Every structure is written in C-alpha cells, then in structure tokens.
C-alpha cells in the first residue's frame, strides 16, 4: 500500500519534530515505510504504532541505539554497571549486559531494544538473522527494522501483538504499549501513534 511520502513528511515534521527533520531521521522513517509497503499488512494503525515505538525508544533519533544511548558497547556496559551498583535499576536481578564467556553482551540494541540472550535467540528464530552469533547486527538499520516489525506483529516481545490492539473497530493506542513494555509511558507513545496515523492519512 503506497504512502504519500511528501504529505507524511510534511505532517510529521511539524507535529513531532519541531519543524525540522535531520537526514538520519528521514532515513529511519523511510526504512519503516519501505518495510510496511512490502504489503504484509495493510492496517496503517499498525505502521503508526510501529513508528511511534521507534520514535520513543530511540529518543526521536529514528536510528538504532544502544541501551543508555552510549556510543559503544563498552560505554553502555559501564553506564549500566554504575546504575546497577547505585541501586538505580531495582527491576534488574542480574546484570544481563555484562559480557559472557564468548565476550558477547546482551544489552539493549535497536529501534526497539531487545535485551537478554534468550530474546536475541527468539528474534533470531523469527527473522532468520544470526543475532545470537552476532548480536551487534541489531544496530544495523535493516536488521533493526525487521526486529521491530516482526516482533510487534508476532508478539515476540511480551506476547501481545499489534492485532490485539488494532483490529476492525478496536483502536487501543494506550493499551498497545503492552506490546513492548507494560504501560510504561503509554499515554505519551499513544500520542505519537495518533500523530503518525494522522500523517499517514488516517
């Protein structure tokens, strides 16, 4: 399903990006539009919420990021270690980001951050991409787009799928946050989703 890209970018530039879009943001948005236009699904609410999720999870950058927004794995690990030692990660029982016996770190990476080896393995099985052998692939745009789209369509992240929240007359912008992370920042992400949906001609 073709999207009027000029109308889309004109709309989001004003509503979500303060009147200006960097080239990297345009590239990230375009990569998600390209994936949607392959035709696997046609419900633009799905695309709007995927865009909203990528926007939120990357702090508006629309490029794959590491947990803590660090430039390198080593810096992300150091930041997480400091936060853990200071008691700022009460939800974490074991430091999953520390390198394993093979030197791999299972910290969060991507447009929607997957963490822990088991989750990399689950997404590897669904996408056919070797995320266990090379977890750093989640930092590549094409791979990260596939992880986000496949994960949100299949329910790989939490068991909840886009179809559980957008189907026929059902439109659940707030509850859709459960696809990724409970109801954390659910109202904020819902607002992004509605803005993207309007920009898509919804």
List each model region and its residues.
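Peptidoglycan-targeting cell-wall enzymes and recognition modules
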Residues: 2-24, 50-152, 170
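An N-terminal domain-cap segment
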Residues: 13-44
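Alpha-helical scaffolds flanking conserved acidic
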Residues: 43-52, 170-177
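Secretory-pathway/luminal and periplasmic proteins that interact with or process carbohydrate-rich
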Residues: 56-67, 157-159, 185-190
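Acidic interhelical loop/turn segments
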Residues: 160-171
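Active-site-adjacent mobile loop/cap segments within catalytic or ligand-binding domains
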Residues: 172-194
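Short secondary-structure subsegments characteristic of cysteine-rich extracellular domains
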Residues: 196-201
């Amino acid at each position: 399903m073709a999207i009027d890209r000029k109308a889309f970018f004109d709309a989001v530039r004003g509503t979500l990006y303060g009147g200006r879009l960097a080239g990297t943001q345009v590239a990230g948005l375009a990569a998600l539009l390209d994936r949607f236009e392959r035709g696997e699904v046609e419900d633009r609410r799905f695309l709007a919420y995927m865009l909203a999720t990528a926007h939120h999870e990357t702090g508006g950058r629309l490029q794959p990021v590491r947990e803590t927004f660090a430039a390198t794995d080593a810096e992300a690990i150091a930041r997480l270690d400091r936060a853990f030692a200071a008691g700022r990660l009460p939800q974490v029982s074991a430091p999953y980001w520390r390198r394993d016996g093979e030197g791999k770190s299972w910290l969060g990476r991507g447009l929607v951050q997957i963490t822990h080896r088991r989750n990399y393995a689950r997404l590897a099985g669904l996408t056919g991409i070797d995320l266990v052998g090379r977890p750093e692939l989640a930092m590549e745009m094409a791979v990260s787009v596939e992880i986000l789209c496949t994960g949100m369509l299949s329910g790989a992240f939490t068991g909840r799928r886009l179809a559980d929240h957008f189907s026929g007359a059902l439109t659940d912008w707030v509850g859709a946050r459960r696809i990724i992370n409970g109801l954390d920042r659910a109202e904020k992400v819902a607002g992004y989703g509605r803005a993207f949906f309007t920009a898509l001609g919804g």
